[in-house]
Amino acid sequence: MLILGIETSCDETGVALFDAQRGLLAHALYSQIGMHADYGGVVPELASRDHVRKLLPLCDEVLAQAGKARSDIEGIAYTAGPGLVGALMVGGSVAHALGFALGIPVLGVHHMEGHLLAPMLEDNPPAFPFVALLVSGGHTQLVRVDGIGEYQMLGESVDDAAGEAFDKTAKMLGLDYPGGPRVAALAEKGREGQYRFPRPMTDRPGLDFSFSGLKTFTLNTVNDAKDKGTLDEQVKADIALAFEAAVVDTLVIKCRRALEQTGCKRLVIAGGVSANKRLRASLEAMAEKLRGSVFYARPEFCTDNGAMIAYAGAQRLKAGQQDGERIVAVPRWPMNTLPPVAEPRQNGLVD
């Protein structure tokens, strides 16, 4: 079954072709980062308009890469949420228009399920069950995964997501959008031990996260250095390192607890922040001590992309799930409300 995957949840237009037998055939991505950088963040209206301009040309580009025609497509998967509603509607509308014209099934899939399943595109995919850390600009969640659509929420952020905290810290330090990679790059120049930031909610039981207090602590540290006239580039790097270390340590501590509580030996990390080198190294060291394994997608599939949507959609479309005539766009959508892949669905995955 040849599936076209479409991702338009935020500021990246992603398209991919996935074959159920041969795997990923082609993928392409257009990033709007340059357009939004002048505004210090994503402008929803501009994002939607750019998706309109770029989506169909990207579809044709991917088909050409794979040597396929539109008539070869046997199903279409698109991101139905969570995300910016206007951006989601662009992807959903194009997917359903193509599906209607070609007479093939269409399904709106969950953006974070796509991230969660992205490591399945690698040569050594994880087996079920596993614990997943979903960590991005909008989400920080720990989930027990027993199968596709079989999700138990173990913990999540009660306020800011880790990726959001990275972006806000970048602004405090005068760095450009997107903040996460720039904070990480600056942290590489930092000196160990110059600052010690708190590891929020690690001094109590449970698997929930909170990063708003850490964000405030960072702001106070930056302002204190400004007041003293010491906020030079080296001090900024020291602060970036202390902040990154605090986030990474917090995530590692919670992941260890989740593995110990569930008895799972496999940990999947997914989402944009999963590309962070310090986080990967720290989680691998922790898992090795527990005689476990860590799985993640290649860096290009950590951020938003069409390949993960094509893969996630393929698993559900093969099982007979589809939207029918309903275009689905859900800005907020808890992942643990998704139905199992074996449950019959002819009117979308959202009740």
Swiss-Prot record:
HAMAP family xref list: TsaD (MF_01445)
Question: Which PANTHER family did the record assign?
Answer: TRNA N6-ADENOSINE THREONYLCARBAMOYLTRANSFERASE, TRNA N6-ADENOSINE THREONYLCARBAMOYLTRANSFERASE, MITOCHONDRIAL
Outline what the protein does. Answer: Required for the formation of a threonylcarbamoyl group on adenosine at position 37 (t(6)A37) in tRNAs that read codons beginning with adenine. Is involved in the transfer of the threonylcarbamoyl moiety of threonylcarbamoyl-AMP (TC-AMP) to the N6 group of A37, together with TsaE and TsaB. TsaD likely plays a direct catalytic role in this reaction.
Compartment list: Cytoplasm
Tell me yes or no: is Iron among this UniProt entry's keywords: yes
Binding positions for substrate per the UniProt entry: 134-138, 167, 180, 276
One GO cellular-component annotation of the UniProt record comes to: cytoplasm
Pfam families, alphabetized: TsaD
Concerning its family, UniProt says:
Belongs to the KAE1 / TsaD family.
Please list the residues that bind Fe cation: 111, 115, 304
Gene name, please? tsaD
Q: Identify the enzyme class.
A: transferase
Task: State one molecular function term (GO).
Answer: iron ion binding
Required co-factor? Fe(2+)
- Keyword Cytoplasm found: yes
Protein name as catalogued: tRNA N6-adenosine threonylcarbamoyltransferase
Per its record, the protein catalyses:
L-threonylcarbamoyladenylate + adenosine(37) in tRNA = N(6)-L-threonylcarbamoyladenosine(37) in tRNA + AMP + H(+)
- Entry's EC annotation: 2.3.1.234
Enumerate the UniProt keywords alphabetically.
Acyltransferase, Cytoplasm, Iron, Metal-binding, Transferase, tRNA processing
Query: What transmembrane ranges does the database entry give?
Result: none
Organism, by scientific name, is: Marinobacter nauticus (strain ATCC 700491 / DSM 11845 / VT8)
Q: Which GO terms describe its biological process?
A: tRNA threonylcarbamoyladenosine modification
Q: How many cofactors are bound and how?
A: Binds 1 Fe(2+) ion per subunit.
